[in-house]
């Protein structure tokens, strides 16, 4: 199962997308916003998304495990599992991770990570008055949103 990007994400980032090396950059920014919002999720129909890749691309490849760890920590907290409950933590990890897949995420894990990215996009569009016009101003405001 691939990483998926909401179709409206491309339009919203259109003025700064030239500054991105990969389309995955947009996905990652939305994911971080969703994680910062406590794992905020949105359900989006597959027809309203585009397929990106099924593995962490480019420079994200070496950071994939860290990204997954942030996702797992957020999910464990979101569902209210105590970090001291090793059995419940391990079950959550088993449900979301599959080391045999290119992304290292299970189908459920990928679906949930995509939903967090969609929710992060919602959070960004709510926080910004208008779509970003320059990368510099976007990053200043983005940093305020995620901290």
Residue ranges and their predicted role:
Residues 1-4, 9-12, 40-147:
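Charged, low-complexity intrinsically disordered terminal regions and linker tails
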Residues 1-32:
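N-terminal leader/targeting peptides and immediately adjacent processing regions
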Residues 21-49:
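Short, basic amphipathic alpha-helical segments that act as recognition/interaction helices
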